[in-house]
Amino acid sequence: MRHIWALPSLTALSLFQASAASAVPRARQAINTSSPLAPFRTKRRFRTQAQLLSNSATKTTLVEEMVTVDTTSRLAALRSLMKERNLHVYVVPSEDSHASEYIADCDARRTFISGFSGSAGTAIVTLDKAALATDGRYFNQASKQLDSNWYLLKTGMQDVPTWQEWATQEAEGGKLIGVDPQLISSAIAEKLDEDIKNAGGGGLVGIKENLVDLVWGSEQPPRPSNSVFLLGQQYAGKDTAAKLADLRKELDKKKAAGFVLSMLDEIAWLFNLRGSDIAYNPVFFSYAIVTQASATLYIDEAKLTDECKTYLERNKVTIKPYGALFEDSEELARRAEADSKDAKPRKYLISSKGSWALKLALGGNKFVDEVRSPVGDAKAVKNDVELNGMRNCHIRDGAALTEFFAWLEDQLVNQKAQLDEVDAADKLEQIRSKHKDFVGLSFDTISSTGANAAVIHYKPEKGACKIIDPNAIYLCDSGAQYLDGTTDTTRTLHFGTPTAKEKKAYTLVLKGNIALDSVVFPKGTSGFAIDVMARQFLWKYGLDYRHGTGHGVGSFLNVHEGPIGIGTRKQYIDVALAAGNVLSIEPGYYEDEAFGIRIENLAIVKEVKTEHSFGDKPYLGFEHVTMVPYARNLIDETLLTPDEKDWLNRANKKILEKTLGYFENDPLTKAWLLRETQPF
């Protein structure tokens, strides 16, 4: 069929998958089956005080948060296209062609077809069913946003199948499953194809035309094409020539022909460029190919300033059109095929997250190896300039958050103001924007009161959010992009008198945060191995939280950065933490329809001195850089040990030393800061 990629036969690759039974939950009842698609509306997105991002497009949203969208007509149109292509199942991933977690509106296909707007999840549509699989961060949100056309697959729960298992079951009897090959990794695609055939299905086919795009039609937002700017050496700390030299050493070690980059943050980091094509993430649509002899950046050249072009030329980087990547990849495959007649060819490397389409264009398994990206590994270990930038921007950001919390308490308690969750988020952004090197937010602020705080990735929308209740928990998870670093901080507060239950929950979460922050571990330890430190106090009471404990953070890059993290994902088992990593430490506790608690700091991994050095290994620990006090009225001191009180006193002393000077002419904030940092 002309719609199907002509694919060579592939050898299936192994892929870790959690085992699960094949039970499928019943479709839940719709909250509002007649809700129409919310109209496109302007949202907060990257802003700049200088002219760095002056050409940034306005971010639009596809659905109002927590509103159910009627997907009946969309599903009918999609199924009609599926029948034309002899497909029984069609998979709609969350990601774009660069495996981005956060995506541009034009790539929000899963949101469009399902109505679910969380950042993680996969939609699977058959000719008579539809399922949405997502993880524990989004169970609450998905249950509110999905209409009655959809099953909710709660990934990781007992007796709930993975989306792959559900799709495979639906393909039994020789049926075909289709997917856009640019939106799925080759590892997942090849394993899924093998599983489908083993279960009696017809297999997985790559459909070149994205069927959701065809349903979306003229209403699909245009692809952003914003300007790109050069990040100076005073912020990057290392020039592109040096980074390319390091990458080429890795290619030589692996005896590779080259590395084809598809991850947007890796490309931005490698070439010391930043953009704004994806809201809150200073990246731009691009690809790159690096060999021992050349480096090519695939990008719309009109996006580059003269300064960027001069810099790239000086670093011997060739510029080619964004759309030429696949054609050039196919040419590389043809050359490799010709060369292989005389000698064993050197393979090209792609990221293990690279798309199925990219691997096929490069010639498949014969000419491609999928690896954990050497650029991603290098990016995750910050240099001294980047680390100092992270320290400095967190002082400024801490001052902004302190000013905001003091203002908010005064407004709610003393002024009796009626402020909704968006009012608060906007005020925080306004305060942040006054600080040096502020560029914009690093993600949409989670400003949540009461029961909304239990929605882990809640996003307030004007006209559909709550008035902040001073007598309920208030959770604020927010971050900013500065030229010298990226921030991500969560604080949970109560502006009235918290209940004993709320205080106990908060204190257990705080104890977990302190324990993980204080841990010392040998080099080679993974984030998986230390995750228990944050959960242990909740576990003693039979409590837990359904999200990871920590994620990597970029340096004026994506707020979620791999490959490192702290949690139970397989990659967190495989990837050891290293000095120079920057991660979040963010345990939490949530009661649906009641309240939510999360306490998040960012921390630098660094070498620490120990009395001994077993196995001649260096030992590592954390230096937390977040400079925001904890909520004193939510702390049950009777649950704290003397060591934990000492930790809090040291932390508060440092916060006071670093931020008090910002408030010499601000008596309200100064008084709030002094009160919240009093010794225990």
Curated annotation (Swiss-Prot):
Catalytic function, reaction form: Release of any N-terminal amino acid, including proline, that is linked to proline, even from a dipeptide or tripeptide
Keywords: Aminopeptidase, Hydrolase, Manganese, Metal-binding, Metalloprotease, Protease
Keyword Manganese: yes
Biological process annotations from GO: proteolysis
Residues involved in Mn(2+) 2 binding: 477, 488, 600
Residues reported in the UniProt entry to bind Mn(2+) 1: 488, 586, 600
Keyword field contains Metal-binding: yes
Cited CDD domains: APP
One MF annotation (Gene Ontology) recorded for this entry: metalloaminopeptidase activity
GO terms under cellular component: cytoplasm
Catalytic EC class: hydrolase
Cofactor note: Binds 2 manganese ions per subunit.
EC number assigned by the record: 3.4.11.9
Cofactor(s) the record lists: Mn(2+)
Alphabetized Gene3D superfamilies for the sequence: Creatinase/methionine aminopeptidase superfamily, Creatinase/prolidase N-terminal domain
Similarity field: Belongs to the peptidase M24B family.
Entry function: Catalyzes the removal of a penultimate prolyl residue from the N-termini of peptides.
Designated name of the protein: Probable Xaa-Pro aminopeptidase P
Taxonomic source organism: Podospora anserina (strain S / ATCC MYA-4624 / DSM 980 / FGSC 10383) (Pleurage anserina)
